[in-house]
Protein backbone atom coordinates (compact mmCIF):
# COMPACT_ATOMS: atom_id res chain seq x y z
CA UNK A 1 0.00 0.00 0.00
CA UNK A 2 1.26 3.48 -0.82
CA UNK A 3 2.73 5.38 2.15
CA UNK A 4 0.39 8.39 1.67
CA UNK A 5 -2.64 6.12 1.51
CA UNK A 6 -1.50 4.34 4.69
CA UNK A 7 -1.07 7.65 6.48
CA UNK A 8 -4.50 8.78 5.33
CA UNK A 9 -6.07 5.52 6.53
CA UNK A 10 -4.35 5.89 9.90
CA UNK A 11 -5.54 9.51 10.13
CA UNK A 12 -9.06 8.41 9.22
CA UNK A 13 -9.09 5.76 11.94
CA UNK A 14 -7.70 8.23 14.46
CA UNK A 15 -10.33 10.86 13.60
CA UNK A 16 -13.05 8.20 13.65
CA UNK A 17 -12.12 7.41 17.26
CA UNK A 18 -11.41 10.99 18.37
CA UNK A 19 -14.75 12.26 17.08
CA UNK A 20 -16.61 9.62 19.06
CA UNK A 21 -17.86 7.53 16.14
CA UNK A 22 -16.29 4.36 17.53
CA UNK A 23 -17.90 4.81 20.96
CA UNK A 24 -21.27 5.60 19.38
CA UNK A 25 -21.09 2.43 17.25
CA UNK A 26 -19.99 0.34 20.21
CA UNK A 27 -23.00 1.57 22.22
CA UNK A 28 -25.34 0.96 19.29
CA UNK A 29 -24.04 -2.60 18.89
CA UNK A 30 -24.34 -3.26 22.62
CA UNK A 31 -27.95 -1.99 22.61
CA UNK A 32 -28.76 -4.24 19.65
CA UNK A 33 -27.22 -7.25 21.36
CA UNK A 34 -29.05 -6.49 24.60
CA UNK A 35 -32.39 -6.00 22.85
CA UNK A 36 -32.31 -8.83 20.33
CA UNK A 37 -29.64 -11.33 21.28
CA UNK A 38 -29.56 -11.47 25.08
CA UNK A 39 -32.56 -13.81 25.52
CA UNK A 40 -31.04 -16.92 23.91
CA UNK A 41 -27.65 -16.14 25.47
CA UNK A 42 -29.13 -15.91 28.97
CA UNK A 43 -31.19 -19.06 28.43
CA UNK A 44 -28.09 -20.99 27.42
CA UNK A 45 -26.11 -19.56 30.34
CA UNK A 46 -28.87 -20.56 32.75
CA UNK A 47 -28.85 -24.08 31.30
CA UNK A 48 -25.08 -24.36 31.85
CA UNK A 49 -25.44 -23.13 35.43
CA UNK A 50 -28.31 -25.54 36.13
CA UNK A 51 -26.31 -28.45 34.72
CA UNK A 52 -23.33 -27.49 36.87
CA UNK A 53 -25.57 -27.27 39.96
CA UNK A 54 -26.86 -30.78 39.25
CA UNK A 55 -23.31 -32.12 38.81
CA UNK A 56 -22.06 -30.47 42.00
CA UNK A 57 -24.79 -30.05 44.61
CA UNK A 58 -22.31 -28.35 46.97
CA UNK A 59 -22.26 -25.24 44.76
CA UNK A 60 -25.44 -23.94 46.41
CA UNK A 61 -23.86 -24.09 49.84
CA UNK A 62 -20.56 -22.49 48.80
CA UNK A 63 -20.08 -18.76 49.10
CA UNK A 64 -20.23 -16.87 45.84
CA UNK A 65 -16.47 -16.28 45.74
CA UNK A 66 -15.88 -20.03 45.59
CA UNK A 67 -18.87 -20.97 43.42
CA UNK A 68 -18.44 -18.26 40.78
CA UNK A 69 -15.05 -19.49 39.47
CA UNK A 70 -16.37 -23.05 39.25
CA UNK A 71 -19.39 -21.92 37.25
CA UNK A 72 -17.20 -19.63 35.12
CA UNK A 73 -15.01 -22.65 34.37
CA UNK A 74 -18.06 -24.57 33.17
CA UNK A 75 -19.01 -21.65 30.92
CA UNK A 76 -15.44 -21.53 29.58
CA UNK A 77 -15.53 -25.24 28.80
CA UNK A 78 -18.77 -24.84 26.87
CA UNK A 79 -18.86 -23.21 23.45
CA UNK A 80 -21.06 -20.37 24.72
CA UNK A 81 -18.55 -17.58 24.08
CA UNK A 82 -17.49 -18.79 20.66
CA UNK A 83 -21.06 -19.47 19.52
CA UNK A 84 -22.23 -16.09 20.83
CA UNK A 85 -19.42 -14.22 19.09
CA UNK A 86 -20.08 -16.03 15.83
CA UNK A 87 -23.78 -15.24 16.12
CA UNK A 88 -23.02 -11.57 16.81
CA UNK A 89 -20.58 -11.42 13.89
CA UNK A 90 -23.02 -12.94 11.45
CA UNK A 91 -26.23 -11.26 12.66
CA UNK A 92 -25.27 -7.95 14.26
CA UNK A 93 -21.94 -6.82 12.82
CA UNK A 94 -22.90 -7.75 9.27
CA UNK A 95 -26.14 -5.74 9.45
CA UNK A 96 -26.49 -3.46 6.40
CA UNK A 97 -27.75 -0.50 8.47
CA UNK A 98 -24.68 -0.69 10.69
CA UNK A 99 -22.42 -0.81 7.64
CA UNK A 100 -24.14 2.28 6.23
CA UNK A 101 -23.64 4.18 9.50
CA UNK A 102 -19.93 3.29 9.44
CA UNK A 103 -19.58 4.17 5.77
CA UNK A 104 -21.38 7.51 6.19
CA UNK A 105 -19.24 8.41 9.21
CA UNK A 106 -16.04 7.58 7.35
CA UNK A 107 -17.23 9.43 4.28
CA UNK A 108 -18.00 12.55 6.33
CA UNK A 109 -14.58 12.42 8.00
CA UNK A 110 -12.96 12.01 4.58
CA UNK A 111 -14.86 14.98 3.17
CA UNK A 112 -13.85 17.10 6.17
CA UNK A 113 -10.23 15.99 5.69
CA UNK A 114 -10.27 16.97 2.01
CA UNK A 115 -11.84 20.34 2.85
CA UNK A 116 -9.19 20.90 5.54
CA UNK A 117 -6.38 20.01 3.13
CA UNK A 118 -7.85 22.35 0.49
CA UNK A 119 -7.97 25.19 3.04
CA UNK A 120 -4.34 24.54 3.99
CA UNK A 121 -3.28 24.59 0.33
CA UNK A 122 -5.15 27.86 -0.17
CA UNK A 123 -3.52 29.42 2.90
CA UNK A 124 -0.10 28.17 1.82
CA UNK A 125 -0.54 29.56 -1.68
CA UNK A 126 -1.58 32.95 -0.25
CA UNK A 127 1.44 32.92 2.06
CA UNK A 128 3.73 32.04 -0.84
CA UNK A 129 2.14 34.76 -3.01
CA UNK A 130 2.79 37.31 -0.27
CA UNK A 131 6.49 36.41 -0.16
CA UNK A 132 7.08 36.77 -3.90
Curated annotation (Swiss-Prot):
Keywords associated with the record: Cytoplasm, Nucleus
Transmembrane among keywords: no
Domain of life: Eukaryota
InterPro entries, per database record: BOD1/SHG1_dom
Subcellular location: Nucleus; Cytoplasm
One GO BP: transcription initiation-coupled chromatin remodeling
One Gene Ontology term, aspect cellular component: nucleus
Cysteines paired by S-S bonds: none
Family: Belongs to the SHG1 family.
Function: The Set1 complex specifically methylates 'Lys-4' of histone H3.
Subunit structure: Component of the Set1 complex composed of ash2, sdc1, set1, shg1, spp1, swd1, swd2 and swd3.
Name the record gives this protein: Set1 complex component shg1
Organism: Schizosaccharomyces pombe (strain 972 / ATCC 24843)
Gene name for this UniProt entry: shg1
